Every structure is written in C-alpha cells, then in structure tokens.
C-alpha cells in the first residue's frame, strides 16, 4: 500500500525500507533516517525505527564509516532536543566528554570535531541554558587544543558565544562559572604547545568581559582579573610567532573588555555613538598595562604581528576614552609607523 505521508514507506518491492521511514518514538518529528544511517548501523530496520535517540547517535558514531560519523555529529543538536535537558546533561554530554575530552589522541576525523564544535553552539542557550552549559567547557577546551586550525577556530568561536550566556539573567549567586573559566584560561595559556595558547588569546577577551559584567568587584575578583591580564601579557610575549599573532589579533577585544566597553570600537566609531564614560581605574589599566602590549606588538619582528596590532588602534583609542591628547601621544605614532612599514 502506498504511504499516506512522507513519514511512511512501502513494504513491498525492492525499495529501501529505510529511505522514507520516520524514526518512531522521541525522534518522530518528520525527520527521516538517511541512507548513510541505514548503512552504518548494524541492526534490523525495525530496530532502528524504535531505537532511542541516544543509542542511535552512539551506534552511528561508532561506525567504521567516516561519512556516517560526520552525519551523526551534524545531528548532535537534534539528538539533544529529542533527549531533553535532563537526558542531555546526564547522558549525552558525559558521553562526549568521555570520548573527546579524555581522549589524548587526535585520531578523530577533523570534520567530525569541526561539526562537534559548531553543534555545541547550537545547543546553547535553547537546550542548555545558563550555567547548565558549564559541562560543555571541558569539551571545547579539548577542541581548542586540536592541531587542525579550523577546528580550533570553531571551538574558540563557540566558546565566545557560550561564555556571555552563562548568566543569562545576570544572576551570579555562585562562583562556579568564574572558577571554571579562570582554570580553563590558565590551562590553555600555560600549556607547552602553541595550539592551545593561540586559542587562549582568542577566549580571554570574552572571559574578562564576563568577569567584568558579573563579578562583585571585590578583592578576590580584582586578583582574578589581574591574573587574566597577566595571561594575555604572557601570550603577547610568547616565543612562538603564531601565539603573538593571535594575541595581536585579539588585543582590540581585550582592550575593550578591560575598559568595560559594551560596544566594539568599530560600532562606536562607525555608528557615531558617543564615547562611554570609562572608570578611572579601567583607563589606568589600559594605559599602563595594555598600551605597552600594543606598542610592543606593533613593533614585533614579524610583519604579520605588526599588521594585526596596528589594526587594534581604534580599540585602544576608545579604551583611552578617545581623549585627543592621549590619542595623539599613544595611538597616532603606531598608526604612522604602520603606514610607513615597508613590509606591506
């Protein structure tokens, strides 16, 4: 008999019984199993149709076929939605942690890891809101250390999306996120391998901005922010050019975070917005801690580092409250030097 809708299939003939069959149970939402899924899971077709979402995900991810594993990872957020928040936190995330975070070998296909990093961003904040997303950070930390650049970049991008959402209502009644974020930054910045350090420079601005927005400004919080600034300074002085290049690339955002700017320098200048009032202490930190980093990176021996540092001039100027005299003294010499640089 012909099916009455796209979720049913013909039982006779030689047609693939899975090609148009909808998954029953928690995934019965019109989603049809792909041929990749049908060929990758070794079990009877009827068993696939009633298999719980998590078991189906694990089975496909355990396939010998790279195509099947990539296909499974692309559906991670869908699996999470089918499992719900409780199932995601109790089963799905621990499974990913065990297989990704605790895996010391980079033997997973880069495309699988790239899709994992992207799917984690999709899961927040809809499925895993606020501090419930904290268990995702160790997974992303591991991905931030992967050798493949596109995987690291996607992990940093996802981390930067998740960090501001850890307190969606500005509620900071416990210190768990602060301790976790600081420890994550320290581990990435303190490793011997440059890949993690490159990622550390990319997430420090978001972590500092989170601290600035939600911490109590007490003595311990001031010390933690000082540690974050020291981490960034150390990265800017690293022996490896790739690390210094990453520090130069993200210096502008770090300056904006330290100055407490809620808008980027580009948004302020191009949007014609008035300069926000910057607290004297924040301006002092920019002047005496970050301006020297800006000046050092803009005169780095590597031309790629110098170029990225000069591009941060607008952020530095906004971090100094766009005061004409300070801009003329601090920012313009760097811009003039960049204009006269013979490397470009």
Segments (PLM) and residue ranges:
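Extended, low-complexity, acidic/polar intrinsically disordered regions
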Residues: 1-344
């Amino acid at each position: 008999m012909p099916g009455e809708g796209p979720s049913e299939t013909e039982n006779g003939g030689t047609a693939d019984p899975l090609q148009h069959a909808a998954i029953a149970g928690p995934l019965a939402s019109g989603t049809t199993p792909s041929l990749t899924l049908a060929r990758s899971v070794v079990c009877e077709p009827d068993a696939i149709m009633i298999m719980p979402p998590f078991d189906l995900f694990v089975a496909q991810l355990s396939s010998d076929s790279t195509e099947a594993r990539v296909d499974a990872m692309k559906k991670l957020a869908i699996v999470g939605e089918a499992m719900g928040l409780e199932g995601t936190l109790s089963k799905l995330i621990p499974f990913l942690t065990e297989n990704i975070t605790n895996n010391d070998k980079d033997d997973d296909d880069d495309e699988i890891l790239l899709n994992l990093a992207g799917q984690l961003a999709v899961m927040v904040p809809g499925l895993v809101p606020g501090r419930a997303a904290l268990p995702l950070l160790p997974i992303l930390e591991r991905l931030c250390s992967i050798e493949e650049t596109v995987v690291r970049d996607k992990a940093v991008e996802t981390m930067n999306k998740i960090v501001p959402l850890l307190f969606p209502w500005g509620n900071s009644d416990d210190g768990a996120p602060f301790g976790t974020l600081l420890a994550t930054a320290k581990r990435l910045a303190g490793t011997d391998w440059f890949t993690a350090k490159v990622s550390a420079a990319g997430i420090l601005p978001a972590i500092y901005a989170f601290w600035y927005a939600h911490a109590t400004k007490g003595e311990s919080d001031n010390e933690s922010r000082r540690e974050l600034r020291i981490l960034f300074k150390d990265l800017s002085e690293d022996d490896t050019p790739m690390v210094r290049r990453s520090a130069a690339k993200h210096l502008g955002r770090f300056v904006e975070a330290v100055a407490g700017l809620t808008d980027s320098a580009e948004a302020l200048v191009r949007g014609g917005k008035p300069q926000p009032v910057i607290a004297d202490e924040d301006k002092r930190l920019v002047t005496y801690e970050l301006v020297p980093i800006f000046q050092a990176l803009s005169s780095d021996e590597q031309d790629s580092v110098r170029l990225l540092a000069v591009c941060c001039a607008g952020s530095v100027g906004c971090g100094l409250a766009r005061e004409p005299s300070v801009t003329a003294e601090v920012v313009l010499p760097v811009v003039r030097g960049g204009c006269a640089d013979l490397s470009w």
